[in-house]
Amino acid sequence: MANVSSPDRKAPLERYRNFGIAAHIDGGKTTLSERILFYTGMIHKIGEVHDGAATTDWMEQEQERGITITSAAVTTNWKQLPSEGCCKLFENENFQLNVIDTPGHVDFTAEVERSLRVLDGAIVVFCGVAGVQPQTQTVWRQATKYNVPRICFVNKMDRVGANFDNVLNDIRTKLGANAAPILIPIGSEDSLHGQIDVVNQKAIIYADNDRMGSTYTVEELPAELKDKAAEALEDLKSRVADVDDELAELYLMEEPIDAPTLKADIRRACIANKFVPIAGGSAFKNKGIQALLDAVVDYLPSLLEAKAAVVTSTVSNGLDENGYETFETKVLEPSDDDKPVALAFKLWADKFVGSLVFIRVYTGVIHKGDTVYNPRTRKRERVGRLLQIQANVHTDVDAVYSGDIAAIVGLKNATTGDTLATDDFDYTLEPPTFPDTVISMAVEPLTKGDQEKMSNALQRLSAEDPTFRVKTDEETGQTIIAGMGELHLDIIVDRLRREFKVEANTGKPQIAYRETITKSADRVQGKLVKQSGGRGQYGDVVIAMRPGERGTGLKIANKIVGGAIPKEYMNAVYAGLNEAMNSGCVAGYPVEDVEVDVIDGSYHEVDSNENAFKMAAIFAMKNAFAKCGPVLLEPIMSVEVVTPAENQGDIMGDLNRRRAAVNNMEHRGTECILSASVPLAEMFGYSTDIRTLSKGLASYSMEPSHFEQVPPNLVAQIVKARGGAAK
């Protein structure tokens, strides 16, 4: 299908830029988002995060705490204005920018994950003082996972201690990026007043008398900056030539490389994820944003150049030689002339509009009143309203087009990760994947009359947030909520009170342990036989089990031969195998990373049914867990501590007492930066302890890293606290 742009859309396919803004907490993402809206003319007054007035921080909790909690989508426009003597790839062309501002706190990493899944590019923001921080590394991995091209913005170059070269070195060494500057700050701290445009070898100078940063001039480089600019240009050419054959040929032959050629090569390398352009400035001081927007247009992909959207059939093609099911895939081309296909990437309950389903349209056009088909539920639903989103402000539109990010009102059965299409489209887009929860706690309403109200509210919140889970403890009857950290659950409880008018008591936070296996078992049987007159129950499943690779969950291969288990019962077998993973045999925690082959079984012509085979599969899994060396896993956190050098010894000693493995230590000026891997179980109360040890001068951040086996000497007390070994 050709890439066709409808005449009704606001901008053609080639003039769309869908990108997100991501960083470590306090990197300045929302401040940058606010400036983008200001300089593109979407807003006419800048709101500051510390005043609770930023456009994209619209939740009460965001305004009170000064942090971003939920991703916010906005749509605006940008036109590259010509500058004398400067090359810009798309002068005087109007571009539509769909921008998502994402949270920086690790507890809300799901918002970053689902945003990067549907975006074509990203600006990754770095603090000019702190450089690469733990959540920056997580964001970088997420962008790499979804093959998202990115531009780096080194922010806060006005702050004391800001060092552009240090951050550049961090990006190259800690993130492994092939990166080079395209816009270098002129000055730093109080003297920050412009940028070197490396490609054009010009100076962008901001007017001293314009605090809003709207007035600047493009000038010849002053003599004292010419050598620095020339060295940066040579480094830029060299690094792009390393990954771009067209530029490499010119570079090696020492042919002249003009600005249009170099920009086109940078664009090609950036879109191919082989090169990362870096810009520096200060969002808070309104310096460097217009040139950054030009870079977004110049170097991030259009809809026609973005990574291809691949859909996978929901109907199996049969088994491969290893017993795994295979499915047909095909590529979707962005076009307004094709049947629509969209991905639901977020749900949100708006108190005025109702339930919103946020979508990214990959191809086709969806109109208000259309019926969309969901391959997961195999149900059709009517599109009641279509909304263009500007943070928390919604505007009704009649249609959304290929590449648009919008919201649908009226869908009752859609959830995060669902594909929405027309007709019987039995293909699905890849859904975003989310990390496991690491912390849980009991919650109960203050009054028994609010129990049902609380349950409904928690279910609604869990539908919105895939990293928030709710379950009932079968032994105690308590409601258990689980999430990514204490702040995450604190916000949930606060939303219960504010939005749903439910006051709740909470228990002490608990670690969300996991279980896995360390050995293999070749043949383990699970059997259900109830035959005492009348129609009975008969299911017989035999499996082989072995440890899987970390992070793979459960992999099932069907190696049944000769019809030992009829095909009509295999879905029930799969359901039982998956259900058994919810509770291991060490302490009843969920099980991870197991490979299972279904190798044999038997059935009864009369007494066999789906439930019998599901139960037999569960029994087989439980029996196999016990034989395969089950162990307990605990969440390990990546922790970074920034402390005055004189407190380094005390901080190190305290980390060692917390079973930490210190991975790296570096000194920057009078500060020491410690990077360590620490069990989450040892980090409760750390905020208070680190303040005491450093007289309030040290700070830390942490994020989930991985799961590791609990030391044998600690397993017994964890099992005891859980209430004994699993039955």
What do these predicted regions represent?
Residues 1-727:
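Structural and coupling elements of P-loop NTPases
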